[in-house]
């Protein structure tokens, strides 16, 4: 699991992806960034 996802941050989806290793790899699920 990566950092928490903040709905106020419009870059969050990209940050989650980056944390998980690339585009489309991360998914914000509620307050958590989950990696596929």
From Swiss-Prot:
GO terms for cellular component: extracellular region. SUPFAM superfamilies: Scorpion toxin-like (SSF57095). Is under several clinical trials (phase I, II and III) as BLZ-100 (Tozuleristide) by Blaze Bioscience Inc. as a fluorescent imaging agent that labels tumor tissue (CNS, oral cavity squamous cells, breast, skin) to enable more complete and precise surgical resection. BLZ-100 is composed of the chlorotoxin peptide covalently congujated to a derivative of the fluorescent dye indocyanine green. It comes from Leiurus quinquestriatus quinquestriatus. The keyword Plastid does not apply. It is found in: Secreted. This is Chlorotoxin. It comes from the Eukaryota. The keyword Repeat does not apply.
């Amino acid at each position: 699991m990566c950092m928490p996802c903040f709905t106020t941050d419009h870059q969050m989806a990209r940050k989650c992806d980056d944390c998980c290793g690339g585009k489309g790899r991360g998914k914000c699920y509620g307050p958590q960034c989950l990696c596929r």
